[in-house]
């Protein structure tokens, strides 16, 4: 029987740390580091991920002001949805973590596929096709520019 030893849970003197103590120590270490990013998630949006990704690629790694300008003047449906999610991420950064909105940029943006609604579409001669209405999950992370330097 093989033993599974986690090297990071062993102290300098060779003693193993209890799991609860290890997790508390890890949380304290993470809490001491300054938070430089904020996230916003929008799930089950009724838009095809393929169509939403084209707009998401245009604002990736852009400054917040530039990304908002691109989304504001775009006529696409995905731009309106991404605008709301980006505004939520900015609000999370300002209100929850005290970050300045002028120093933020879009560090990460993902559009994943959600569940599909399947509907029947009547066709000729008594047949039917399946119409798939796709959904998307959108994840946006904004980071502080000064923290990356």
From Swiss-Prot:
List, in alphabetical order, the Gene Ontology terms for molecular function in this entry: rRNA binding; structural constituent of ribosome
Keyword Membrane (UniProt): no
- GO CC term, one of those recorded: cytosolic large ribosomal subunit
| PROSITE patterns registered for this protein in UniProt | RIBOSOMAL_L22 (PS00464)
**What keywords are assigned to this protein?**
Ribonucleoprotein, Ribosomal protein, RNA-binding, rRNA-binding
One of the Pfam families matching this protein, by short name: Ribosomal_L22
Q: Per the record's keyword annotation, is RNA-binding included, yes or no?
A: yes
**InterPro entries, per the entry:** Ribosomal_uL22, Ribosomal_uL22_bac/chlpt-type, Ribosomal_uL22_bac/org-type, Ribosomal_uL22_CS, Ribosomal_uL22_sf
What biological-process terms (Gene Ontology) are attached?
A: translation
Domain of life of the organism encoding this protein: Bacteria
Q: What does the subunit section of this Swiss-Prot or TrEMBL entry state?
A: Part of the 50S ribosomal subunit.
- Protein's job: This protein binds specifically to 23S rRNA; its binding is stimulated by other ribosomal proteins, e.g. L4, L17, and L20. It is important during the early stages of 50S assembly. It makes multiple contacts with different domains of the 23S rRNA in the assembled 50S subunit and ribosome.
What NCBIfam families does its record include? rplV_bact
Q: Which family does it belong to?
A: Belongs to the universal ribosomal protein uL22 family.
Protein name per the record: Large ribosomal subunit protein uL22
Species, as recorded: Petrotoga mobilis (strain DSM 10674 / SJ95)
* UniProt gene name: rplV
